[in-house]
Regions:
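Unchanged
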Residues: 5-160
Length: 161
């Protein structure tokens, strides 16, 4: 699972993200940015959960620190390969449907997690209405693969601008 947890009643979302990052990885004083909010009714098998996903980018990887409710922590290299891309018509709209293979390999190379993720978005217009869905998953928390794909697409789009 990615670092994260629940917001305290008197806590802002960004403060929750910073607290959880510190508690579960030991990282502090790094810039973070909200990239998406996930709130489908049945997205989390535990309960009705709304997730605010934040992105952090760091230059150096300090030793991972597991704390709080995290039993262990590690750094993973991310490999993303676009497996396919097609333009389709749906409800009179041009939709771009992309399929991605995601692979996470820990820094020791002895743990690997994979997923296949579908990304559908409007081909035209400013509002893309991006829908990201996990098609296949191996050892990544239930829908966290789509958070990773979304973050990588966010970075790609930011670099392109």
């Amino acid at each position: 699972a990615l670092p994260g947890g629940f917001c305290e009643i008197e806590e802002d979302l960004i403060d929750t993200a910073r607290r959880e990052l510190k508690e579960e990885t030991g990282l502090t004083d790094i810039p973070i940015e909200l990239i998406n909010t996930w709130g489908e009714v049945n997205r989390d098998p535990r309960d009705r959960i709304i997730t605010a996903a934040y992105l952090a980018i760091i230059n150096d990887m300090p030793a991972p620190v597991a704390g709080d409710d995290a039993c262990d922590a590690d750094w993973f290299n991310i490999e993303i390969r676009q497996r396919g891309r097609a333009k389709i018509q749906k409800d009179g709209k041009d939709i771009i449907n992309s399929l991605y293979n995601l692979k996470l390999i820990n820094r020791h190379g002895d743990e690997e997690c994979t997923a296949m993720v579908s990304v559908k978005e409007n081909a035209k217009g400013i509002i893309k209405e991006r829908k990201i869905e996990v098609i296949d998953n191996n050892n990544i928390a239930f829908d966290h693969a789509r958070f990773i794909i979304d973050a990588m697409l966010y970075i790609d789009n930011s670099i392109d601008q």
